[in-house]
Structures are given as C-alpha cells and as structure tokens.
A protein has these predicted regions:
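Short, low-complexity disordered leader/linker segments with a strong preference
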Residues: 1-38, 61, 432-436, 440-450
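Short, solvent-exposed loop/beta-turn-alpha elements that line the ligand-binding surface or hinge
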Residues: 115-129, 172, 200-201, 218-238, ...
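C-terminal lobe and pocket-closing loops
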Residues: 119, 280-293, 306-415
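Hinge/lid segment of periplasmic solute-binding proteins
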Residues: 99-153, 207-210, 294-303, 384-388, ...
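Glycine-centered hinge/linker elements that transmit conformational signals in sensory
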Residues: 182-187, 225-257, 298, 302
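Extracytoplasmic/periplasmic solute-binding protein
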Residues: 140-149, 154, 177-229, 263-265, ...
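Extracytoplasmic "Venus flytrap"/periplasmic binding protein-like
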Residues: 58-129, 165-167, 266, 270-275, ...
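Conserved C-terminal helix/tail region of periplasmic/extracytoplasmic solute-binding proteins
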Residues: 66, 164, 378, 388-450
Length: 450
C-alpha cells in the first residue's frame, strides 16, 4: 500500500471497536458573545480541574460564553475525542488533545488551524510560546493546529525525608541501576510505602509513556529507520524486564491498574519513596492543599542507562474540531485558556505552583512563579529543552516521537502491547511472550511503510 494511503487509512485504527455515532451540538450559527454555550472535552488532570473551577467566574463573566465541560480519565478521553473527531460527530467545540494526535489529525483535515487567530492577536503573543511545544502541534503546512495548555517532559521525583532517614543521596542525573538500588532500600510494605511508583495501567499513553523512555535509554526502539520492528529485540526486552521487575518487587499496590492519576495520589499521600513521571505533576505535589508531601520532594532528571538524557516531550493542548459551528467562541476560550493572563489568574487564585507551565517562555520570568516553583522549574525547563523527538535513543528513527511513534497505527499497537506488559506485571504472562506477540503486531504495522 502506498505510504500516503496507508497513513490515511490507518487513522481509522485510532478508533475503538464498537464506537457509536456521536450527537450534534444542536446547530445554530457561530456566535462569539453572550448567550453562547460551547462544549469542552478534557482529560481529568489537575490543570483541567483548575480551569473548570475558574471559567464561570472569569471567562464567562468577561465574554458571556458558557463552557460546558466533560472530564474523562486519560484512556477514556482518547477514545472519546478520537471517535468524535474522526467520525465528524460534532459533539464538542474544543477538546484537549496531545502532541501525538495533532499532526496526524491535521493531515486528515479534522482540526481548525489556529495560527491565523493566534498571530492576528497581538495580546496573545504567539511568539512567547515555547518552540518545542509549537513544533509538536504543527501540521505539514507549517500551521499550528492546537494551542498548548501546558507542556511537560518527565523526571524523577523523590521524597527527601525518606532519603534522609536512610542516609541516601539522590544524584541530579541518576541511572536506572541507582534507582533500583534506592527502591530496594526504601521499600517498606509493612508501613504501606512503595520503593517507587511507576505506571502499570494499559494504554499507549499510560504504561508505555514511561516505559518507552526506558526502552530508548537501554538502546531499544519500536522500529529501526527502515521500519524493521524491534519489539522483541534484546534491548527492548531488557528494558521491559527491568521495568516489570522493578514494579513487581518495589512498586505500588495495584500497579497493573495504576496510571498517572493513581501514582500522583500514591506519591502525594507519602505512600511511595520515588515516582518517575510527568514534570507537570510537580505543581500539584507542591500545593499543600492537594499534597501531603509539599516541600518534601526533590526533582532530578529522568533516569538513564546508555543515553545522556531520556525525558519525554508532551503537551496537552486545546484543539478545535472542524465540525464546530461556534469557532469564534471556541477560539476565545482557547486563547484565554492558553494566555499569560490565565497563568496569572491561576497563580493569584489557586497558587503559583499550580500554573499550567511548560508552554510559555515568559512563565519562567514571573517572580512569584520562580519562587513557588524553585524546587522543580529549572529541571523541568532543562528536561523539556533536552528532549529530542528526532533522535531520542541510540539509533535513527523512521518517525518523530520520544515516548511514542508518530504514526496513526501506534495508538492501537502501543495499547495492545501495553495490555500484555501490564498482564506481565500482574503475573499472568511473561515479558518474553508479551513482546513476542508485540513483535508480530509491529510487523503488521511495518508492512504499511515498506
């Protein structure tokens, strides 16, 4: 199959089996002012919960536009928004989407381009947006198809009190071998404390977000430059064996069902000594109203094995489906949600550590933010700047992406393999079998690109 046709057809693989047609927005002409209601679908992360709290008393009062939010867990969100956008359902006027989806959906004509509005509004200051984030949301035509709400890499978080109690010192650039040693010394199941929390929940963007960075730094890859699959290669296997073994020995309770949200709660409640995950978690951990470990957490670069850095690159961004009939109102919301003024609002109303950072250069010059985020801001920005979607490992890659492969089929492939790896964590299968099955699935994908 020609590559262009393969990509277009493979977009359908993002859909889950048995999806039904979505409803409509109720029609009506576009309206950017009072009396208008727009629908927003977003992932249930803390930053999105914050915007839900702030919208009515601020955005709606200023514009007269009401926003009806639907919040879903990450995996459910991905299924729901993919179904609606791909099927042209028109149920949502705006939605949070990630760096993986945006270039693919832009190619398929499913999203409005936002560069025109962003560049026309001088107060929005599009030039202030961090270049890695804008690049990850740009289509083949060079236009931006989603506006970054917050950006992130990944790093290692650790409980400083627990380390001090054991006389341990965390290096700024730890290796995975050091992390495993720390986990063994800090794990205390008798007191309900795990040595480390790592995602075990199936999902290409759940379990395989951290795991693929481990694969990269162990010298592995999903595909070589010529699309040769390497899912059961020694390096991929060694990384997965290490990850699964680390969780089984020293990980959190219920690890096969633990994703970002569950690990945030576990670590934030002081029930884990370390957590390797998104840099965006730091704001919540440093909020004393949301975390029991505020002021007790240290932040260091993503653990490595054979590479110098291994953090991922991701942004949750606001996109506007082509099917919306309320594009003007939708852009007003998107521009507000991703503006400097919104960051200031969050800082003043909810606390500066909760600002949705990682998207604007100016954020890191705000005195109040720098003070509240001093424990993690430098490592966060350094991690974002060192993330390399073009060359995240030890060999050339056929597609962009650090913790994912930037092709439509990866959502289905990554999720299927993650289900088997999660089962290995649960003890119902082996890593070798999981990756042998994954290799066969990857071979089927590779046929589209040979």
């Amino acid at each position: 199959m020609p590559k262009r046709l393969a990509i277009a057809a493979a977009g359908l693989l993002l859909l889950t089996a048995g999806c039904s047609g979505a409803g409509s927005t109720g029609g009506g002409s576009d309206d950017s002012g009072g009396g208008t209601t727009i629908t927003a679908l977003m992932v249930g992360n803390p930053q999105m919960e914050d915007i839900q709290k702030l919208t009515a008393d601020n955005f709606t009062k200023q514009t007269g536009i009401t926003v009806k939010f639907t919040i879903l867990p990450e995996n459910e969100l991905r299924d729901k928004v993919t179904q609606d956008v791909a099927n042209q359902g028109g149920q949502y006027d705006v939605a949070t989407v990630g760096a993986y989806e945006v270039p693919i959906w832009a190619k398929n004509g499913w999203l409005h381009e936002l560069s025109t509005q962003a560049q026309a509004d001088a107060s929005y200051d599009a030039g202030d947006l961090l270049k890695p984030m804008v690049q990850s949301l740009t289509g083949d035509d060079g236009k931006m198809y989603a506006a970054p709400f917050y950006g992130e890499s990944s790093f290692l978080m650790y409980n400083k009190e627990m380390f001090t109690a054991k006389g341990l010192t965390m290096p700024e650039h730890p290796t995975w071998a050091q992390v495993a040693d720390f986990a063994a010394k800090l794990d205390d199941k008798g007191k309900g404390v795990a040595g480390i929390c790592l995602r075990g929940l199936p999902g290409w963007g759940e379990l395989f977000a951290p795991l693929t960075t481990v694969v990269n730094t162990y010298g592995g890859t999903w595909f070589e430059k010529d699309w040769t699959p390497k899912v059961n290669a020694p390096e991929f296997t060694a990384a997965t064996d290490f990850y699964v073994d680390l969780i089984k020995k020293y990980g959190e309770k219920g690890a096969p069902q633990a994703g970002f949200t569950e690990c945030l709660n576990t670590f934030g409640q002081g029930k884990a000594a370390m957590w390797y995950d998104a840099t965006s978690a730091a704001g919540t951990l440093e909020d004393p109203n949301a975390s029991k470990v505020s002021g007790k957490v240290g932040y260091v670069y993503a653990p490595v094995n054979k590479t110098e850095y291994s953090g991922w690159l991701w942004t949750w961004a606001w996109a506007m489906p082509k099917t919306t009939k309320k594009a003007d109102a939708a852009w007003k919301f998107i521009s507000w949600a991703t503006s400097k003024d919104y960051e200031k609002l969050v800082g003043e109303k909810l606390g500066w550590s909760r600002v949705p950072s990682g998207k604007r250069t100016s954020t890191y010059s705000i005195a109040e933010y720098k003070d509240s985020a001093k424990a993690f801001a430098d490592v966060t920005l350094g991690s974002i700047e060192h993330a390399n979607p073009q060359n995240p490992g030890l060999q050339p890659r056929p597609a962009l992406g650090v913790q994912y492969v930037g092709i439509p089929e990866f959502a289905d492939l990554g999720t299927k393999v993650s289900q088997e790896v999660s089962a290995a964590i649960a003890g119902s299968t082996t890593v070798d079998k999981a990756l042998a099955d994954g290799q066969k699935q990857a071979e089927d994908v590779a046929k589209n690109y040979k």
